[in-house]
A protein has these predicted regions:
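Conserved ABC transporter NBD signature motif
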Residues: 74-82, 91
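Helix-to-loop junction immediately C-terminal to a conserved catalytic motif
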Residues: 66
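Conserved catalytic motifs of ABC-family nucleotide-binding domains
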Residues: 170
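Conserved ABC ATPase "signature" region
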Residues: 126-144, 196-197
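Conserved ABC ATPase signature
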Residues: 149-153, 157
């Protein structure tokens, strides 16, 4: 199944859609709209990549899904339900978040970084330990990184620790904000492979935002091209290569694929 825009007319049961944007608009300070009339339906169990330059609105999309921001107009639904107005703590436990540069707390050990949200969620020490060791193994990390601090391990290891944290609470949905851009290209390829394997094993739906078309093509089942707060084109990689919607999309294809 692929993601479809609302205008396509394709019927999907609510439980098949992990995130839905319905006529969503967002602006800051009354200035130009950051998001302008976004309509998207993203299928559960897949990875959708939103590709765009800085300022295109792609990070704002993630912040709306995670309820860090609220839309000025329209609605965002997660697994068929409107984002709640209260009890956001429980809502966010179903969402994992991975960011550029891993976003680890420097004063916590790598283990403490990964286990923090589970501890706050009331998980027992034994449950946290079992899940932590499971993720460490899946991410290809040695236990010796556990009691070290983020600055004492490589950038690639930090990124893997950050992904462990994102997967810790067994989320249904994973939000990825350019999480691999801070590591070198060779290391990145290995992390791509590991991420894809763990995501498939965990059965997680994911929404990736990136400026890198090659990264999107490597990781995603479906692409959304965003510019100036509007969706320019959506489709599979093959669809977009075969028929770019405009000059900007054609430039992305020629320069990055």
């Amino acid at each position: 199944m692929t993601a479809v825009s609302q205008s396509s007319g394709q019927e999907q049961r609510p439980e098949e859609v992990c995130v839905e944007f319905c006529d969503v608009e967002k602006s800051f300070g009354g200035e130009q709209k950051i998001l302008d009339g976004i309509n998207l339906r993203l299928p559960a169990g897949t990875t959708t990549a939103v590709v765009g330059e800085s300022g295109s609105g792609k990070t704002t999309l993630l912040q709306l899904v995670n309820a860090v921001l609220r839309p000025d107009a329209g609605e965002v639904r997660v697994f068929g339900q409107p984002i709640p107005q209260d009890d956001l703590v429980s809502f966010r436990r179903g969402i994992g978040y991975a960011v550029q540069g891993a976003g680890l707390f420097p004063h916590l050990s790598n283990r403490e970084n990964v286990e923090l949200l589970a501890k706050l969620a009331g998980w027992s020490a034994s449950r946290r330990e079992a899940r932590y060791l499971q993720l460490l193994a899946m991410m290809g990390l040695d236990e010796e990184v556990s009691d070290r601090y983020p600055h004492t391990i490589s950038g690639g290891q930090q990124q893997r620790v950050g992904l462990c944290r994102a997967f810790m609470l067994q989320p249904r949905l994973l939000l990825l904000d350019e999480p691999f851009s801070a590591v070198d290209p060779i290391t990145r390829i290995g992390i791509y492979q590991t991420f894809s394997e763990v995501k498939a094993r965990e059965g997680v739906s994911s929404l990736l935002v990136t400026h890198d078309m090659r990264e999107a093509a490597r990781l995603a089942d479906y692409l959304v091209i965003l510019a100036r707060g509007r969706v320019l084109q959506e489709g599979t990689v093959g669809d977009i290569i075969a028929a770019p919607a405009d000059d900007y999309v054609q430039m992305l294809v020629k320069e990055q694929l």
